[in-house]
Amino acid sequence: MRLWPARPRRRSAVPPPEDVLVTEEQLRRNVEDVLVVRDRQVRGSVVVFRGVLTIEPRRALELLIDRFRPFGYTPFLRQEGDTVAVQAWPLAETAVPRRIGVNVLLFVVTCLSTLVAGLSFAGSPTFDALRASSSAARFLAGLPFAFTLMAILGVHELGHYVTARYDRAAVSLPYFIPAPFGFGTLGAIILMRSPARDRNSLFDIAAAGPLAGLAVAFPAIFLGLAWSSVVPMPPGGYTAFGDSALTWTLAYLRFGPIPPGYMLFTHPMADAAWAGFLVTALNLFPVGQLDGGRIAYALFGRYHRAIGKATVSALLLFGVGSFLWNFRATGGDAFAALASSLNWFVWAGLISFLVGFHHTPPLDDLSPLSPGRRLVGVVCLVLLVLMLPPVVIH
């Protein structure tokens, strides 16, 4: 669900000033054929060279990575005014366990928690026979929901992992997060052990997860809606997931307008696809370390923080607008209005306090994003709008 930077376990010891000066001279000799050096500076253990590149940034980065590694440094290319800065940072080793026991255990526990959650979604008439049979069969009624949701999340994480390895970024295996409520999971995270090489690589790693997950979610919702049915509405009312523009359109194309007094009873596979769309939409918020935040950085560079803050402000405004609209629609019922608009405030709060607005830049922050990737980035932002439900549960 989210690419989370790993916490450093051990950083190369900060060398004494005299050693830094010696290293600075060695690094300068390895930079001079790549950068016409106009200025150099030592900031603690960081050595900065400023000037004009003599070759294109991607090639410069490849050369400098190999040249700096023997000295225990890694290069970062930055634009500073009208000059290019080559920053040499000490190498860091990150605490990403190489054993996969924890990954496997969390995956198994998450499978069980989503299976239990799936029992609450097995109310479709399709499962009448299962509900009438043994306890074991009733328990297995949670499989369609659990299998579908885990497939969406698993392929999402696999998209991140495979793309990161292809782009030579060091990442961990996914850590799935079980939950005793809701859908039975809070998604998964992948720990990054190294920065992305450039904006294209950063974009590929970020966008691969949501797009891969949607490649499973769309067939799932088509099948789920095909197996859903329109039934009479129960006398006491019912609780249902709120529609996004995407899910409403797909349901309308399948069933047309629902007659008064009837409701759509969705198959658990459709419920799991709905959950997959929601998780993907939340991940595409252009904020911080979320997939959408990485896409925003690749698209807009240093403006990504302003975009993230504007996104949170927009969520709060939508929350206030939703509350006022529902307050009027319910005849002044403040509790009902707050319940209908609470999701906007929760999303804004979680993003602000748990995700934040910081993003680790790539090694090469000079090379622009390719036009094709810019188009895919716009598609991802459109998908966010289409998949985000104004009301989660009504």
For each feature predicted by the language model, list its residue ranges.
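Hydrophobic transmembrane alpha-helices and their immediate loop junctions
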Residues: M1-H394
